[in-house]
């Protein structure tokens, strides 16, 4: 613990909070006085060091050796702690890498600067030049010879965010959360590393990164409700994309045999701990592969992300260990139901009337047009999905719920499709792609019929995509990985809002 922390902190957010409006008014008066003295927000200081690199390089150096070297440093950051003691003071400065303590004396910085410093507040952004030394307690610190105020903070920082009462504030004012919570900062640094590792993995396997439209004339590529907007110049109703799939497959038709995209999808659906209407997905397509190749490849990609974020393929999520280094289990939908809900017989699982009655017990009202495969999938979602804690591929999805996937040669009622579940959540969805234009057109027509029967998540008919397939698409495998859910897993975050910098919120007023 630093010397600044050992003493009573001069902190507006003490146990007895003053009226925030009063504090803001006081700070505005201070800013007014600073403006009258000259440049209130200077921009001519350039830090030469960051806190963490100084700790890494000099924490282990003995005090005498450090003093003899007289190492000059220049740092800048936000003042998080402050302790004034007559003619000498300590403060803690936080930059992008961490925190370091500074030591200020009237003798070293001059009377005018020292008197000004005493009026500065927590949250102010300051700059300091000086030399490194160790305090009596062994704390690496900067003995300041030059001190400047770069930005006056008008709002007091909270002492901390604590408990569920402040959860909404954390999401709504993420900028404050990032200032005061090291855990939050670590989460989003890890997210950046995960995305970078996935991108590097894809590029190392000769995939081409592309960007496809966010505004679609016809929504497609997934079963979901779209957001609708209007293109004024074209006087055209358009849809925020729910998936990039159909455009990426057009690129495979065009000869880009390995493509991927990391970008946003938008689905006009509910909010939950695992759903945000705006979310990040990586989709990739590889010609001359199938769903079995994809499963092996997806495993390797997720392991690479885990090692980048956690340093190991063995991670902990919500107090339980997960080994992403072991081969992932593979089960059919029926196999998963029988494993996790063994009370059901094969005969019952093949009886549509029974399945409809059983689903009612879970509060699921199955639409009349749903066939056996869709009913089996619905029962799987109610009985087995949440129990798939360890990485598990659910394979062989019914054709009727997989309108873009290739049917199995051995059983045309199922497709060469998988979904990957970890901790009871879907992380990835992939399949051998349907490249038969006539079969795809027939499935689109079936989706249109389902939409007319009341299924508002069924797909539209996309004539241009059919035209693309008619030019010929090679045998192809494709997969989508939910980046947000993967980041949740690898950062031990219980809610998707914890891994999205600015999640959707209701208006404050």
Curated annotation (Swiss-Prot):
Binds 3 Mg(2+) ions per subunit. It is found in: Cytoplasm. Mg(2+) 2 binds at residue 426. SUPFAM superfamilies: Class II aaRS and biotin synthetases, Nucleic acid-binding proteins. It is an enzyme of class 6 (ligase). It comes from the Bacteria. Keywords: Aminoacyl-tRNA synthetase, ATP-binding, Cytoplasm, Ligase, Magnesium, Metal-binding, Nucleotide-binding, Protein biosynthesis. The keyword Aminoacyl-tRNA synthetase applies. One of its GO terms (cellular component) is cytosol. Pfam families: tRNA-synt_2, tRNA_anti-codon. GO terms for biological process: lysyl-tRNA aminoacylation. The keyword Phosphoprotein does not apply. Its cofactor is Mg(2+). It catalyses: tRNA(Lys) + L-lysine + ATP = L-lysyl-tRNA(Lys) + AMP + diphosphate. Its main location: cytoplasm. InterPro entries: Aa-tRNA-synt_II, aa-tRNA-synth_II, aa-tRNA-synth_II/BPL/LPL, Lys-tRNA-ligase_II, Lys-tRNA-ligase_II_N, Lys-tRNA-synth_II_C, NA-bd_OB-fold, NA-bd_OB_tRNA. Homodimer. Belongs to the class-II aminoacyl-tRNA synthetase family. This is Lysine--tRNA ligase. It comes from Methylobacillus flagellatus (strain ATCC 51484 / DSM 6875 / VKM B-1610 / KT). The lineage of its organism: Bacteria, Pseudomonadati, Pseudomonadota, Betaproteobacteria, Nitrosomonadales.
